[in-house]
C-alpha cells in the first residue's frame, strides 16, 4: 500500500463521461484510483496483454495493482511508471485544437457525418498542427485496441500528444 498526499494529486478538472479517477504522481510513479470499481483491473489486464502484441514497449504503459491510501480512505487502483520526462507535458486533442483554431474539435467532428471523412479530418488536422507524420498509424492502432477491448469511453479529452517547451510534439 502506498500513502499519497494532496501535493501529489494530478486529477484534471475535466471529467470523462465515466467519471473521473483520482490520479497522483510521486517520485516517478503515477497512481490511479478506481472510480467505478473496475478501471484498475481493466488497465492491468489490457496493459499486460499488450506485451504480447507487436507494439514496442515505449508505445504503452504497464500497470500494476496498488492499494492507495489518500486522506482517510483506501482505494483500489493501479500504478505505472511516469511516461512524461523533463519539460514535456500532455495536451489533449481537444485542447490542442482549441488553442490553434479557437473551436471545439469534438463539435467539428460531430458535424462530419461520414466516419471515414471524420477520421481523415482528425488525422490531417493533428498532423498539420504537430507535424507528427505517423499520427494516422497511431490513431488507427488506438481505435483498434479500443474496439478489441470494448473501450466505450474514448473522446477528444482522453486522446493526447506530448509537447515540450520548445513546441515539439511526440
Where are these regions (language model features)?
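Acidic-enriched, low-complexity/disordered segments with a strong bias for Aspartate over Glutamate
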Residues: 34, 58, 85-87, 114, ...
